UniProtKB/Swiss-Prot annotation:
GO terms for molecular function: RNA binding; rRNA binding; structural constituent of ribosome; transferase activity. This is Large ribosomal subunit protein uL2. The gene is rplB. It comes from Leptospira interrogans serogroup Icterohaemorrhagiae serovar Lai (strain 56601). One of the primary rRNA binding proteins. Required for association of the 30S and 50S subunits to form the 70S ribosome, for tRNA binding and peptide bond formation. It has been suggested to have peptidyltransferase activity; this is somewhat controversial. Makes several contacts with the 16S rRNA in the 70S ribosome. Pfam families: Ribosomal_L2, Ribosomal_L2_C. Residues 216-279 are annotated as: Disordered. It comes from the Bacteria. NCBIfam families: rplB_bact.
Length: 279
């Protein structure tokens, strides 16, 4: 997948870049696997802002993705590779031998006409899903379950993956790009390969309007607000805030760990991810 850049004929196009979508084979989704979802624009049930900086995105249909891959030992043929506006990775429409259609996350390198399968006896091949305990060490996987039968939760975004690092009893050690090592039960499903669209992080938004299409509204700095609106607000002239960075509600930010220390899943984290000291 290549990156397309533009001549600076306008200020907006000077830094803008887009994917060339050369791998995409279908422009319209498969209608029986789409839904219309209500967009809340960051508002709660009372109509008040619950999450700031959201609203005004373009309309889109939700594609129903099969994250569980529990239709075992039935081969399926890849019919198309499609763009999904609801996620950064591409999706594939597959047709099982019994005639059922399904959407799955497209792994990098998959093509129309390829055959994929799920189940414990499946071949170690890109796009096949199986219990993570059946996958040999050193293999890259995506769409990894954390709870048996719940569906994939780890490595679902564009270009993401985890690597099988070893075994500890009935648990498999999964190493993530963040350097975190986590234990996953051997019966949890995972899909072979790296998630598609690995050039996604190279795309430059380029202009404010494109962010608005995605539903992202402008973010105002706290130091330019009044004291009633933000802890960093107020002061005569331009100030630096006068205190360590905090959120509008006073919680420390920029380096402050916000993960709850009593989460039950903490016992499955063997090695914590490294913190970037340069940020």
């Amino acid at each position: 997948m290549g990156i397309k850049k533009f001549k600076p004929v306008t200020s907006a196009s000077r830094y803008k870049s887009v994917l060339d979508f050369a791998e995409i084979t279908e422009t319209e989704p498969y209608k029986p696997l789409t839904l219309t979802l209500n967009y809340k624009a960051g508002r709660g049930d009372g109509g008040k802002i619950a999450v700031r900086h959201k609203g005004g995105r373009v309309k889109r249909k939700y594609r129903i993705i099969d994250f569980k891959r529990r239709k075992a030992n039935i081969p399926a043929v890849v019919k198309s590779l499609e763009y999904d506006p609801n996620r950064s990775a591409f999706i594939s429409l597959i047709c099982y031998k019994d005639g059922e259609y399904s959407y799955i996350l497209a792994p990098d390198g998959i093509k129309v006409g390829d055959t994929v399968q799920s189940g414990a006896g499946s071949e170690i091949k890109i796009g096949n899903a199986m219990p993570i305990g059946k996958i040999p060490p050193g293999t890259n996987v995506h769409n990894v379950e954390l709870q048996i039968g719940k569906g994939g939760q780890i490595a679902r975004t564009a270009g993401s993956f985890g690597t099988i690092a070893g075994r500890d009893g009935e648990y498999i050690l999964l190493k993530l790009p963040s350097s975190e090592v986590r234990k996953v039960h051997e019966n949890c499903y995972a899909t072979i390969g790296i998630c598609s669209n690995k050039d996604h992080n190279l795309v430059s938004i380029g202009k404010a309007g494109r962010s608005r299409w995605l539903g992202k509204r402008p973010s105002v700095r706290g130091v330019v607000m009044n004291p009633v609106d933000h802890p960093h607000g107020g002061g005569e002239g331009r100030t630096s805030g006068g205190r360590h960075p905090v959120s509008p509600w006073g919680q420390p930010t920029k380096g402050y760990k916000t993960r709850r220390s009593t989460r039950p899943s903490d016992k499955f984290i063997i090695q914590k991810r490294k913190r970037n000291r340069n940020r």
